[in-house]
Swiss-Prot record:
This is Glucose-6-phosphate isomerase. Its EC number is 5.3.1.9. The gene is pgi. HAMAP family: G6P_isomerase (MF_00473). Belongs to the GPI family. The active site is at E357, H388, K514. Keywords: Cytoplasm, Gluconeogenesis, Glycolysis, Isomerase. One of its GO terms (molecular function) is glucose-6-phosphate isomerase activity. It comes from Mycolicibacterium vanbaalenii (strain DSM 7251 / JCM 13017 / BCRC 16820 / KCTC 9966 / NRRL B-24157 / PYR-1) (Mycobacterium vanbaalenii). The keyword Cytoplasm applies.
Amino acid sequence: MGSDITATPAWQALSRHHDEIRAKDLRGLFADDPTRGTGFALTVGDLYIDYSKHRVTRETLDLLLDLARTAGLPAKRDAMFSGAHINTSEDRAVLHTALRLPRDASLTVDGQDVVADVHEVLDRMGDFTDRLRSGEWRGATGERITTVVNIGIGGSDLGPVMVDQALRHYADAGISARFVSNVDPADLVAKLNGLDPATTLFIIASKTFSTLETLTNATAARRWLVDGLGGSAGQDAVSKHFVAVSTNAKLVDDFGIDTANMFGFWDWVGGRYSVDSAIGLSVMAVIGRERFAEFLAGFHLVDEHFRSAPLEANAPVLLGLIGLWYSNFFGAETRAVLPYSNDLARFAAYLQQLTMESNGKSVRADGTPVSTGTGEIFWGEPGTNGQHAFYQLLHQGTRLVPADFIGFSEPTDDLPTADGTGSMHDLLMSNFFAQTQVLAFGKTAEEITGEGTPPNVVPHKVMPGNRPSTSILATKLTPSVVGQLIALYEHQVFVEGVIWGIDSFDQWGVELGKTQAKALLPVLTGADSPAAQSDSSTDALVRRYRTERGRTA
């Protein structure tokens, strides 16, 4: 049997402490410590992180840090950074942090100079995107490229989509990006709508160049391009309108892409950790190699903080442990991520894959069952949209939902308010600060009664407060800050995975469904009535589908 973290004295001490503290509220904690608002906060790079509105005391944090040490967090963190094979089920190193090492750094893993490999790919990406952005790279008809379409799925899509939207203000070369992921043809059709084949370039992002959804979309895109250009130009166009992010040179060549325009990455990069690799080629095409370097530098800044800061002043460690505190001791199952920036509209969706694919595991790294809940469920929408949708549940519902608020002092865009005298960004951020305040401190029946509210309405207006949140405030949404935010959450995922004893870097749970889909496709499309399926529900669904498609049921 593997080591059971819940059987350790550190876990049991936390359990006893939870019994003692769970009745305390944030009003009382702030009243007891007038300096709490600044004492439970720290600055990492451009991020000011306020964790004072959490249901924790100094003792809570000390006990959580004892748990981290009991689980061997410092040694396991060092093992990750050094290139040890901590992805045990696949016997792989986990080196997304190497993707943002500076050129003069040194890291050799399994006999390979990792830093040299990373920068060789970055240099090739930079040279390619320089040609694209300057207009030197031309399509088959001699026109310059104005749109790149990234075709990928999962980590090959969610990261680039999110970062492209977040950094839209840094698009400075007349190139825009679109993203196709879903095998539903509606996705590709919508994204190609209005595009000119002569000025469109496709990036096919698939490590193996065999991902079903990606290759299906890529083949349809190739047909659209060839048909759109017509004649000999269409037949010869693939090499000038398609590039690949892959490691399978043979299949890339078979598709018609010049392997000189293939950008690779490595087995030690998981898809959900890959936006700062060649998977970010579409981002670099839009914002340029210098801004992309700033993006990588933001990651590296937080990497170095996570690697070297004392545990008690280490932002990813503290935030990861606080997330685990709610998940395992308060029974909270979800965490809301609420960016007060419309440019971060896809950040919660990006974090869903990062966190839930990483820590959605029911066995420990040694294959034995876990003894406690794992994997926070992440969700969210930008403020203030969420305030008019689901904040009601956050404020007055029966479920505890810790929330992360992310905001910026300087806007990427600003407009005057209705009377022409104020700033819409100030209005946005007043909501940010108000929501964290009301979640924490609420409003009592006595306060509401004192305002003259009818007695029968008072219970409906009571805001219980004591709803925890983290506030992350940065000066402005820049390439570096986006990198810092991503790394902050990457390392929280690692911290929680270490405590739970799971492998946060495999994803076997996604495989069986893909295999079964391949088996079911001929059942859906075959000319003859299919054999009965193994369960009556699937059998009935398949037959109804075939009937509605005009096929023999």
